[in-house]
């Protein structure tokens, strides 16, 4: 099972290596505006899944939102600690 920290490390490594065909790299190349659209889309899907779908489907949507939020963090040059200081 992957943790929030594991995912961030994996995505950071992909951002540094920039493997060809990586969806993470493509999203980073879309910039903050493009990533922001994905964050908003996924947030809406989380809401709808929590309202109308199973807990498993809601958890999957939440995991996708967390992925896109972490991509945004990387695009902005933020670390986990930058966010943790506000929790």
UniProtKB/Swiss-Prot annotation:
It is an enzyme of class 3 (hydrolase). It is found in: Cytoplasm. Coiled coil: none annotated. One of its GO terms (biological process) is L-histidine biosynthetic process. Its main location: cytoplasm. Pathway: Amino-acid biosynthesis; L-histidine biosynthesis; L-histidine from 5-phospho-alpha-D-ribose 1-diphosphate: step 2/9. GO terms for molecular function: ATP binding; phosphoribosyl-ATP diphosphatase activity. Keywords: Amino-acid biosynthesis, ATP-binding, Cytoplasm, Histidine biosynthesis, Hydrolase, Nucleotide-binding. Its EC number is 3.6.1.31. GO terms for cellular component: cytoplasm. It catalyses: 1-(5-phospho-beta-D-ribosyl)-ATP + H2O = 1-(5-phospho-beta-D-ribosyl)-5'-AMP + diphosphate + H(+). CDD domains: NTP-PPase_HisE. NCBIfam families: histidine_hisI (TIGR03188), PRK00400.1-1 (NF001610). Belongs to the PRA-PH family. This is Phosphoribosyl-ATP pyrophosphatase. The lineage of its organism: Bacteria, Bacillati, Actinomycetota, Actinomycetes, Micrococcales.
């Amino acid at each position: 099972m992957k943790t929030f920290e594991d995912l961030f490390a994996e995505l950071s490594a992909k951002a540094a290596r920039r493997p060809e065909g990586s969806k993470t790299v493509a999203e980073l190349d879309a910039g903050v505006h493009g990533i922001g659209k994905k964050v908003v889309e996924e947030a809406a899907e989380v809401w709808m899944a929590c309202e109308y779908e199973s807990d498993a489907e809601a958890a999957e949507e939440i995991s996708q939102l967390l992925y896109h939020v972490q991509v945004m963090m990387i695009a902005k040059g933020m670390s986990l600690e930058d966010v943790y200081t506000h929790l």
